[in-house]
Amino acid sequence: MIKVGITENSIRMEGHAGYHRDGQDIVCSAVSALTCNLINSLENLTNVKIRAETEEGYTKIQWENMTAAGRILVDSWFLGITAINQEYNCIEFV
């Protein structure tokens, strides 16, 4: 199960979906792709300053002074992981 915590100034994710064995888990791959894209987009397409920590099974993104453009990117990321969870039920929002 991937645990996702969202606050006004951060996103924290930890764990694995457990949908398939390591290296073949399409749920973990999809969540990772969306999250990497969020980090890259916030860094390159907005003026939002972020701090991102990533390790195996753990990601934390923090920011201050979120812009409207940054909020749209975070909302888009959230829509994506919500859709994944509706299909595979492997994400717990905490």
Label each residue range with its predicted role:
Residues 1-26, 33-94:
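N-terminal intrinsically disordered, cationic/polar leader segments
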